[in-house]
From Swiss-Prot:
Belongs to the universal ribosomal protein uL14 family. The gene is rplN. It comes from Edwardsiella ictaluri (strain 93-146). GO terms for cellular component: cytosolic large ribosomal subunit. Binds to 23S rRNA. Forms part of two intersubunit bridges in the 70S ribosome. Part of the 50S ribosomal subunit. Forms a cluster with proteins L3 and L19. In the 70S ribosome, L14 and L19 interact and together make contacts with the 16S rRNA in bridges B5 and B8. This is Large ribosomal subunit protein uL14. HAMAP family: Ribosomal_uL14.
Length: 123
């Protein structure tokens, strides 16, 4: 469950380390984002010579949350932290070329098949 001002880790090699959610996209008064939702973020911490720099405002897709996601069989998949993958503002394709850590099957839509194929593990 991600809302405005939530700090997230970055699960790709775009050069960002920590980001902050500044808006949950998809509705005028939408409060929370879960796994697979697109959010607007600003970069708070980045490595030198990365593809992005501190202060950049981008879109990102949430790939892991502490709250987790409930499956139709009743099971819940939870993670130790909140993480996202940075997206290009126009094409909504991932900026990085590698994904770190597991992602969930809930991302398996037409828009995020690239993230699924790059991920080392799909839960």
């Amino acid at each position: 469950m991600i809302q405005e001002q939530t700090m997230l880790n970055v699960a790709d090699n775009s050069g960002a380390r920590r980001v902050m959610c500044i808006k949950v996209l998809g509705g005028s008064h939408r409060r929370y984002a879960g796994i697979g939702d697109i959010i607007k973020i600003t970069i708070k911490e980045a490595i030198p010579r990365g593809k992005v720099k501190k202060g950049d405002v981008l879109k990102a897709v949430v790939v892991r949350t502490k709250k987790g996601v409930r499956r139709p069989d009743g099971s819940v998949v939870r993670f130790d932290g909140n993480a996202c993958v940075l997206l290009n503002n126009n094409s909504e394709q991932p900026i990085g070329t590698r994904i770190f850590g597991p992602v969930t099957r809930e991302l398996r839509s037409e828009k995020f098949m690239k993230i699924i194929s790059l991920a080392p593990e799909v839960l």
